[in-house]
Amino acid sequence: NILWSKSRERLIFPIFSEDKLLAYWGRYFGEGSEPKWKGLGAMRDIFHFIGSPSYDKIVLCEDIVSAIKLSKFCTALPLFGTHISVDRWKKLSTIIHKKSQVIIWLDPDMYSKSIKHANVGRQYGMNTEIILSDLDPKEHTLVDIARYLIK
């Protein structure tokens, strides 16, 4: 479920495990100087996979809106930012199958960070790749996303 908070002017994405609320991530749409994205909960500890649970192809992206859009084609994992800690890579390497393709698709200004993250993923035995595009994943059409992912 996606919610709207009129008082906070945020689109709210709650994250549940069964019936328990683990965290939420909100996107600000107001005119003020609030942070664009804001969350509550242990966002860096959550693996909120969206899409097909097959895990053949997993795309790591910055935000939940991109993950929702990417999930039309693969399993997507929002990072709730751009950082992937070594501990998070370790945990991810125990969750997914070693033959899974792990694609890092961050915003265009994060290309060098994507390269570093891909190298760490490879150190943990994962088949990591990078997608570099001129737009955030959420800003692409579904046709464009399919072209990037089918290559």
Identify the function of each model-found stretch.
Residues 1-2, 129:
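Short, surface-exposed acidic
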Residues 3-98:
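Phosphate-handling DNA/RNA-contact segment within nucleic-acid enzymes
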